[in-house]
Regions:
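Intrinsically disordered, low-complexity regulatory segments in ankyrin-centric signaling systems
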Residues: 1-39
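Conserved ankyrin/ankyrin-like repeat signature
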Residues: 32, 64-65, 95-96
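Leucine-rich solenoid repeat scaffolds
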Residues: 77-103
């Protein structure tokens, strides 16, 4: 799994336990994110480090996933270490930056 370096990702794979929604969002798997949400997964759930699905999608450049999460109530102002907007800015994902700023 490729994630940008801004993520609070452990060095050891044994420590990497992402919640279902965060995992699928980080990979840009729109259909899996839709399934998770349909199955009642909390759109604002986070991993142990406080990293949300919206942050994962924004950081990794998945605009379609970002939009789906926002449409389903993701908190765009939530800040773990960084907000989703800050992560998108650091990763230079212009379309996501513009979308999040338009909200």
């Amino acid at each position: 799994m490729k994630l940008n370096s801004f993520s609070p990702i452990p060095e050891n794979d044994d420590e990497l336990h992402l919640p279902e929604l965060v995992y699928w969002a980080s990979l840009g798997e729109l259909a899996e994110v839709e399934k998770s949400l349909a199955n009642g997964v909390d759109v604002n759930s986070t991993d142990d480090e406080g990293y949300s699905a919206l942050q994962a999608a924004a950081e990794n450049g998945y605009l379609d996933v970002v939009k789906l999460l926002v449409e389903n109530g993701a908190n765009v102002h939530y800040k773990g270490e960084y907000t989703a907007l800050q992560l998108a800015e650091m990763a230079e994902h212009v379309e996501i930056i513009e979308y999040l700023k338009s909200l």
